[in-house]
Design a protein with these regions (language model features):
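Catalytic cysteine-centered active loop of the rhodanese-like fold, especially the PTP/DSP P-loop
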Residues: 86, 191-192
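Catalytic-loop region of hydrolases
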Residues: 17-84, 102
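Positively charged n-region of N-terminal signal peptides that target proteins for export
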Residues: 1-6
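Hydrophobic h-region of N-terminal signal peptides that target proteins for export
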Residues: 8-17
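N-terminal cap/lid subdomain of alpha/beta-hydrolase-fold enzymes
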Residues: 57-164
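Conserved acidic catalytic loop of the alpha/beta-hydrolase fold
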Residues: 146-149, 156, 171-191
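Mobile cap/lid helix-loop segments that gate and shape the active-site cleft of serine hydrolases
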Residues: 164, 168-171
Length: 192
């Protein structure tokens, strides 16, 4: 039994000593379908990282997001007029996971009426998803999920006050949302 402890400790050391970095501005898109109120809904799922920029235009954080857009009969003009729900958890330290797979996303966890998982474990279509009437972006604030602060050219992180606190959250998340809408809906940036 004592050897198992040491093996676990050694493996943990090697896993934690690896430097893992995510690209600060990247995305992956897939296409899916679901049924809501008896109607087939085609939608696009996009996961990615999008930077938070400072006053000088340098990235100071990168936020992980999941973005769902309806595809059925949606023109570019309709997309600009379609409601966008921005969802993130209240934290501190809690990502958007539970809103995502708990109630508004196109897929939800298989759970019973009391909230316990049922077998076979996994996810199922969410007949109450709002993707039929609004697009949804689930955002993980800094230090939740994969979202992180970014070191500057000197290897230093930005001041924590920029990200942790009510006013800081309002400022940087508001800026991030403006950039997101500008990129995804207004189409102001290339390769979005």
């Amino acid at each position: 039994m004592n050897n198992i402890y040491w093996y676990f400790l050694l493996i943990s050391f090697f896993v934690n000593s690896q430097k893992i970095e995510f690209p600060i501005d990247t995305l992956v898109r897939t296409v899916h379908e679901t049924a809501i109120n008896g109607k087939k809904i085609n939608y696009q799922a996009e996961v990615g990282m999008q930077p938070v920029w400072d006053e000088d235009g340098l990235p100071i954080a990168s936020l992980f997001y999941t973005y769902y857009t309806r595809l059925n009969n949606i023109s570019k003009n309709d997309l600009k007029n379609r409601p966008l729900i921005v969802s993130f958890n209240g934290g501190p330290g809690s990502g958007s996971l539970w809103m995502h797979i708990g109630y508004t996303g196109p897929k939800i966890l298989k759970i019973d009426k009391e909230g316990f998982p049922i077998q076979p474990y996994g996810v199922k279509e969410n007949p109450f998803s709002i993707i039929d009437v609004a697009d949804i972006v689930f955002v993980n604030p800094v230090n939740t999920g994969f979202s992180r602060m970014i070191k500057n050219k000197d290897g230093e992180y930005p001041d924590r006050e920029k990200f942790f606190g009510i006013n800081a959250d309002i400022k940087y998340l508001g800026s991030w949302i403006n950039s997101f809408v500008s990129r995804k809906i207004d189409g102001n940036l290339p390769n979005t």
